[in-house]
Curated annotation (Swiss-Prot):
Name recorded for this polypeptide: Guanine deaminase
Catalytic activity from the UniProt record: guanine + H2O + H(+) = xanthine + NH4(+)
PANTHER family in the record: GUANINE DEAMINASE (PTHR11271:SF6)
Cofactor remark: Binds 1 zinc ion per subunit.
Organism of provenance: Homo sapiens (Human)
Modified residue annotations for Phosphoserine: 453
GO cellular-component term (any): cytosol
Positions that bind substrate: 84-87, 213-214, 240-243, 330
The UniProt record lists the keyword Glycoprotein: no
Length: 454
């Protein structure tokens, strides 16, 4: 007889589950049973041979089990630790300039348009739909300096069921495109309004994040006040650091009294255990030590680092310093909205560093898979809630079908010997796309295919 106090189960799946742990970068669990409670949490993950025991404990019948096809598998939802939702309007174009010129010619004019709420709604709706469809269950979004349209992004994200951090961009310095900046007072006041109004909505999985654009667009006064807001409200923080050489030099010239780029953020209370900094290509060992001491994270954005000719992040060096790290698409400096692309580019960048004898080894695909899932969750301070299929975590997952209609993957006899092989998983990570992502779950709720309400 089953225990009466057990909560009802929303899902029971039987099949293959692929995830990471801190001791194993890719664990393939074949013929397992996974149960999801009505609250969206994983309550068991055990070998299918334990079905009778689990059925007694959790009060389910064999007919309630959904059996995956032998070629299908579940993997954790992908975590995009750095994406500019507002730049989605020109993603896939305009990447012919280095960072600072790119910001002036393309990015600031594009973001300036988001004072138009109708335009913002169209772009934000499309980017949330597109990223969810491509398996991004958690996204860390930059919006723009416009509070109302940034609040709209949070609302849209919640409506679609995506887990997210949403940041209203703060910048009170911008001589290259002066139409797109705030006064210091406006930026502080509007950030406080943004945070307050977002928190009043009580979204279950969408949170505000304090977002100074980067040191070149923020005065010391603004950075200090944003650091205080984050500290007082116990909020996450996101920004950019050491993306390209010209930027690093410009920061040195703008803030000559600081020891280095990292200290600019650190001395203004912006480098905490809730901070995620994008790029970090030129961080010194000394700076990485500070990241480790503060518990701050790095978002590795290989596509944009290559597309804007910014540099290479040495992930192995970051890991050697025990700094938390995840992957980011960095739309639109990165032209792809797909985290699968981020996985592939991260492997390639690591291979380039090996070829150039910077490192003695390269990251494996399995290690990068972990960065895109468990690593990303840790970088955003969510590894106690999501990132893999450990019991007690929320079920953020994507169902992969390598044999989907019009699949970009060709499978052969050797790919299957009764159960799914690791070759099939690798083929999906290297060759797959949204056609292979049949279903997406966030917090136990199926969000793709989309419901008629969105």
């Amino acid at each position: 007889m089953c225990a009466a106090q057990m909560p009802p189960l929303a899902h029971i799946f039987r099949g293959t589950f692929v995830h990471s742990t801190w001791t194993c970068p890719m664990e393939v669990l074949r013929d397992h049973l996974l149960g999801v409670s009505d609250s969206g949490k994983i309550v068991f993950l055990e070998e299918a041979s334990q079905q009778e025991k689990l059925a007694k404990e959790w009060c389910f019948k064999p007919c309630e089990i959904r059996e995956l096809s032998h070629h299908e598998f579940f993997m954790p939802g992908l975590v995009d630790t750095h994406i500019h939702a507002s730049q989605y309007s020109f993603a896939g174009s305009s990447i012919d300039l280095p960072l600072l010129e790119w910001l002036t010619k393309y990015t600031f004019p594009a973001e300036h348009r988001f004072q138009n709420i109708d335009f913002a709604e169209e772009v934000y709706t499309r980017v949330v739909r597109r990223t969810l469809k491509n398996g991004t269950t958690t996204a860390c979004y930059f919006a723009t300096i416009h509070t109302d349209s940034s609040l709209l992004l949070a609302d849209i994200t919640d409506k679609f069921g995506q887990r997210a951090f949403v940041g209203k961009v703060c910048m009170d310095l911008n001589d290259t495109f002066p139409e797109y900046k705030e006064t210091t007072e406006e930026s502080i006041k509007e950030t406080e309004r943004f945070v307050s109004e977002m928190l009043q909505k009580n979204y279950s999985r969408v949170k505000p994040i304090v977002t100074p654009r980067f040191s070149l667009s923020c005065s010391e006064t603004l950075m200090g006040e944003l650091g205080n807001i984050a500290k007082t409200r116990d909020l996450h923080i996101q920004s950019h650091i050491s993306e390209n050489r010209d930027e690093v030099e410009a920061v040195k010239n703008l803030y000559p009294s600081y020891k280095n780029y990292t200290s600019v953020y650190d001395k203004n209370n912006l480098l905490t255990n809730k901070t995620v900094m994008a790029h970090g290509c030129y961080l010194s060992a000394e700076e990485l030590n500070v990241f480790h001491e503060r518990g701050a994270s790095i978002a590795h954005c290989p596509n944009s680092n290559l597309s804007l000719s910014s540099g290479f992040l040495n992930v192995l060096e970051v890991l050697k310093h025990e700094v938390k790290i995840g992957l980011g698409t960095d739309v639109a400096g990165g032209y792809s909205y797909s985290m699968l692309d981020a996985i592939r580019r991260a492997v390639m960048v690591s291979n380039i560093l090996l070829i150039n004898k910077v490192n003695e080894k390269s990251l494996t695909l399995k290690e990068v898979f972990r960065l895109a899932t468990l690593g990303g969750s840790q970088a955003l301070g969510l590894d106690g809630e999501i990132g893999n299929f450990e019991v007690g975590k929320e079920f953020d997952a994507i169902l992969i079908n390598p044999k989907a209609s019009d699949s970009p993957i060709d499978l052969f006899y050797g790919d299957f010997f009764g159960d799914i092989s690791e070759a099939v998983i690798q083929k999906f990570l290297y060759l797959g796309d949204d056609r292979n992502i049949e279903e997406v779950y966030v917090g136990g709720k199926q969000v793709v295919p989309f419901s008629s309400s969105v």
